[in-house]
């Protein structure tokens, strides 16, 4: 019996070694650890200067990333933030849903700010699904029908496009570049499906088909089989960075459902959205804002509907890049971060916008949840009703009341600011590798 166990053990070890040795490099991932707007784009921009390829794996132009490079502020919605690095290839993966008019509008706006030669360094998956204008109309109608129970959607058509994908009548980029007659038939079919469900929407089919025929030659230079491209890159030792859109608490499975987006914006979405196996994943970087914000509706346990919330909103310029709506603000939430770390397996943390807390005499941190009955929770609530019934217990930490904006060395931060970082680190049992104290990439401090 002992011989059998040893043989099986060797087989297992050989299998494991065989699978991992196929690739000469790993894929590092940057994920939002809260409800979005954590500053992922800035972290990606910082790391993109050291990698060969940057990828988007899910979501659409409902995401918003702001990057400041060489004094110029770029706003990205579909383009990966890594496009500011001219030596880097940017990939829009199969899990992304693409509204072509918005994509090319975004390209033009950023070219006007100095972003050049994208045709040489942007690749779009032929398997990515298309978002059409009628998807956006339906999105707005569905939100309006909910009345006071709206989900806070961006009305960019993301949910309806993923619905089309799930019901197997969506249209992919590769189909646009194939036989246009077949594309036209599929387009008419999907329009008719939506008209049966939403008779009031207006779609000029001929005009839309003419518009998309114009897009064929425009988009063709960018389109490739990204799955093959990425696996070849890994076998050749190329370094790859993935920029997650949205954030863990907006994940369709793990977020505060139904106040979520329509894709998997946790680590699982990276694998399915790019066609990567689990053993290719290296570092998983959780980006954590030094306080908590949320755009739109839904539960928010540590929200501060008072002067603290107003101060955070004002000092942090908390306005959505995509929606232009004011973000709701509150204290840092440790139970929430423990939960998203559980799901994503963060190997390190980047804390952003620490400088926004500079003026506060004391800072609260939510450290545990308890029910109204007084019982402490040992898990993150899975339903809205349960989450609405909890009370947050806070730790109170002393503030530092001095500017950190121009500090570039962790040991030069005020002692209480360092203690705030170390407190988060100890609570999550995940090392904090970077701390951000400003807008540009130069404001990110290396902790270790």
Swiss-Prot record:
Cofactor dependence: Mg(2+)
Main subcellular localisation: cytoplasm
InterPro entries assigned: Adenylosuccin_syn_GTP-bd (IPR018220), Adenylosuccin_syn_Lys_AS (IPR033128), Adenylosuccinate_synth_dom1 (IPR042109), Adenylosuccinate_synth_dom2 (IPR042110), Adenylosuccinate_synth_dom3 (IPR042111), Adenylosuccinate_synthetase (IPR001114), P-loop_NTPase (IPR027417)
CC cofactor note: Binds 1 Mg(2+) ion per subunit.
Transmembrane segment boundaries: none
Binding site for GTP: 36-42, 64-66, 327, 353-355, 436-438
Gene3D superfamilies given in the database record: Adenylosuccinate Synthetase, subunit A, domain 1, Adenylosuccinate Synthetase, subunit A, domain 2, Adenylosuccinate Synthetase, subunit A, domain 3
Record has Hydrolase as a keyword: no
Residue numbers binding Mg(2+): 37, 64
Residues the entry annotates as binding substrate: 321-327
Keywords recorded for this protein, A-Z: Cytoplasm, GTP-binding, Ligase, Magnesium, Metal-binding, Nucleotide-binding, Purine biosynthesis
UniProt binding sites for IMP: 37-40, 62-65, 154, 168, 246, 261, 325
GO BP terms in the entry: 'de novo' AMP biosynthetic process; IMP metabolic process
Subcellular localization: Cytoplasm
Pathway: Purine metabolism; AMP biosynthesis via de novo pathway; AMP from IMP: step 1/2
Residues annotated as catalytic: 37 (proton acceptor), 65 (proton donor)
Gene Ontology MF annotations: adenylosuccinate synthase activity; GTP binding; magnesium ion binding
EC number per UniProt: 6.3.4.4
PROSITE patterns the UniProt entry points to: ADENYLOSUCCIN_SYN_1, ADENYLOSUCCIN_SYN_2
Entry's Gene Ontology cellular component terms: cytoplasm
Subunit structure: Homodimer.
Similarity comment: family membership: Belongs to the adenylosuccinate synthetase family.
Protein's recorded name: Adenylosuccinate synthetase
Source organism (scientific name): Drosophila virilis (Fruit fly)
